[in-house]
Amino acid sequence: MAPSKQADFLRALYQDWTDRMVADPNLSIANLRSMFDEWGQPALEPENVCYKSDRLGGVEAIWALPVGADNSRAIVYTHGGGFAVGSADSHRKLAGHLAKALNVTAVVLHYRRAPEHPFPAQIEDAVAAYKALLEKGFDATKLSTAGDSAGGNLAIASALKMRDLRLPLPGSVIAFSPWLDMALRGATLETNSTTDALVGRGILEAMAGMFLGSKTVPRDPLANPLENDFKGFPPLYLNAGGDETLLSDSETLHAKAKAQGVKTVLSVVPGMQHVFPALSGRAPEADEELGRIAAWYESLCFGHTHRQLRCGTNPTRS
């Protein structure tokens, strides 16, 4: 099935960003951040979701609070943007839609960004916020980490760091189009290079350089979760668009995690761009994907789901 007309909004936005970066390859980090703050445009404002600023473990954050949600459950959400751009504000609507779909709360972290703060500052901030929630009395099994693109990496890497620190692990991890391999070895970097409107090898190399800095190698097992061990990792939901260059990262992690005993789901929706759930409230493909995640979450937490899902996008799942 061809992508919906509404899904073209994201492709057009990404193409506009790409054109602007090609026209001015020396855009300052400040101008890049200003441009990528437009990431908040694709998602429509979720109905009956309130927002509140907070500070958790020293990290600035925005709570997304759906009316009637289970306040004992929360998502720690890390935004995308190559570890260097994007913000809690640019991603609050996406987090709000996810929280509403799961009937939980979400807290979107404005973690320290590269290049001013290279690895591992971002992971340190995510873990600090998570620990603050534990100190507030949250049950770890009722917490989830989630994120998109580079933030999907952080959602996964922060859980790995929690395991290393022997902290109670979150009950689940959700990653939209995670960028995992700082060594850039994925086959779809080449095979999907003409269908992905935003993410190519050049932009990834630049972002990886800012994130890793001068002291971290591309195959460091926390900066690059594909190099890590996933034994004992929480249940994992991976989502990707069929047209994106980072698809291989999700496929590789899914296979590795599954082989090591992780309860993992990979949902790939054909014809979709990078982080297409950013279209939540606008495009049916995004809303249907959130419905599938919600059904998975309900089954995971409660052993059943009452949801009736439309799967017109025909995702491939494994």
Residues covered by each model-derived region:
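Short beta-strand/loop motif that positions the catalytic acidic residue
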Residues: 238-240
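Short beta-strand element of the alpha/beta-hydrolase
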Residues: 72-81
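A glycine/proline-hinged amphipathic helix-loop "lid/cap" segment
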Residues: 1-69, 217, 298, 302-318
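Catalytic nucleophile-loop/oxyanion-hole region of alpha/beta-hydrolase
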Residues: 87-88, 94, 107-142, 280-286
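Hydrolase active-site cap/lid region
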Residues: 160-218, 232
